[in-house]
Amino acid sequence: MYRALWLLARSRRLVRPPASALASAPGLSGAAVPSFWPPNAARMASQNSFRIEYDTFGELKVPNDKYYGAQTVRSTMNFKIGGVTERMPTPVIKAFGILKRAAAEVNQDYGLDPKIANAIMKAADEVAEGKLNDHFPLVVWQTGSGTQTNMNVNEVISNRAIEMLGGELGSKIPVHPNDHVNKSQSSNDTFPTAMHIAAAIEVHEVLLPGLQKLHDALDAKSKEFAQIIKIGRTHTQDAVPLTLGQEFSGYVQQVKYAVTRIKAAMPRIYELAAGGTAVGTGLNTRIGFAEKVAAKVAALTGLPFVTAPNKFEALAAHDALVELSGAMNTTACSLMKIANDIRFLGSGPRSGLGELILPENEPGSSIMPGKVNPTQCEAMTMVAAQVMGNHVAVTVGGSNGHFELNVFKPMMIKNVLHSARLLGDASVSFTENCVVGIQANTERINKLMNESLMLVTALNPHIGYDKAAKIAKTAHKNGSTLKETAIELGYLTAEQFDEWVKPKDMLGPK
């Protein structure tokens, strides 16, 4: 039987279905029907675990329990790269569901059969809700335009809509993946649209909330530590005093700026390429289609999406994603500094700086009993390093848009989404398992501050830089205190030293 089917496909003898079959096809409602209909191979193969579907290259076996079709299967054959861990990110698939629903709704306004449009919208909603995730097997490493993933989405929505209308999977009747689901669209404008939708949602649902949580926790610690005076450090060496609260206020400001930078990049992310079709001209769309689709997407997501003012830029360049990735890269730099400072200040417990007492979350060593490590700081710094690497990849991808189309799209969005998720999740983890539980080791802080030679800086206005420097160097050489040395050198009295060297008076301008 299957040999006969293969020969039939090879000879391309496609038979026209009888008029009665066309008339009785479920849900046609006057919709355009292809001139030629593939042979009834799907029914013939249904007794097994697969059905036969066709693309322009010929027939392929498609698993009966999957909604995708021939083009998706062909992509799995051609791009066996990386395995399941390299699949197209779920946020992109969900974003496609949102886009396809919006497009179907607008296409209905322009004359698409309401029965077909409604079925597409229902199927697209299921995609957007994640109900059909198992039907998207394709990896990131495919065509750089994301065409295979766009067709994966089209096929899944088409077959699910056909099923809803009582039709036969793979028949493309009454809902065709290209003619109906992809109507007025191209992979070249749908994929960048899905990229922006996915990135915006991830930023708003994961990244910004995580950073805000971290900001608030650091701000609370800054206020809690406002009266604790400690020695400062520059070049990792002793410097003049400040409060632990002041030190933490620097971290607060860094995270505040991170949020500001990310928000500043979002207006370009809100611009959608939909309506540009193949090269940005809008071929095969209707006037107003782009604006209406953007408005529908905005309504569905609650985010201020608009149509891109220049579709040529929206298809050929992805500077908006590079900009957002750059903001996240800067955020990673900030978080690397913050996490490193906190773990170094908490080093010890007896042989390090030991100014901070960090929460103990789990055993730290398989050989050293009782050892506890700053694991949340380590996780955060690894995340920061990964985000920096992701930005390099995004930068390379963004710089390689050639002529009318950038063909690094899947790789770019994979890394942008990865960075947003990692930074958001790590911020929450770092906050809940480290920052909120940080305590100040005031005994250690006071000891280190009182032993610091840099308190001598307070004497500059009274005895001059050169004498103050001699006090510090002599005290360091002899192992004596600043006060003892200053008196021994005859530069000032004990009373003068006590009056002039007061750490609490060294915290700001007079």
From Swiss-Prot:
CDD domains: Fumarase_classII. One of its GO terms (biological process) is DNA damage response. The modification Phosphothreonine is found at T85, T90, T236. Gene3D superfamilies: Fumarase/aspartase (C-terminal domain) (1.10.40.30), Fumarase/aspartase (Central domain) (1.20.200.10), Fumarase/aspartase (N-terminal domain) (1.10.275.10). Pathway: Carbohydrate metabolism; tricarboxylic acid cycle; (S)-malate from fumarate: step 1/1. GO terms for cellular component: chromosome; cytosol; mitochondrion; nucleus. Substrate binds at residues 145-147, 176-179, 186-188, 234, 366, 371-373. Belongs to the class-II fumarase/aspartase family. Fumarase subfamily. There are 2 substrate-binding sites: the catalytic A site, and the non-catalytic B site that may play a role in the transfer of substrate or product between the active site and the solvent. Alternatively, the B site may bind allosteric effectors. Catalyzes the reversible stereospecific interconversion of fumarate to L-malate. Experiments in other species have demonstrated that specific isoforms of this protein act in defined pathways and favor one direction over the other. This is Fumarate hydratase, mitochondrial. It comes from Macaca fascicularis.
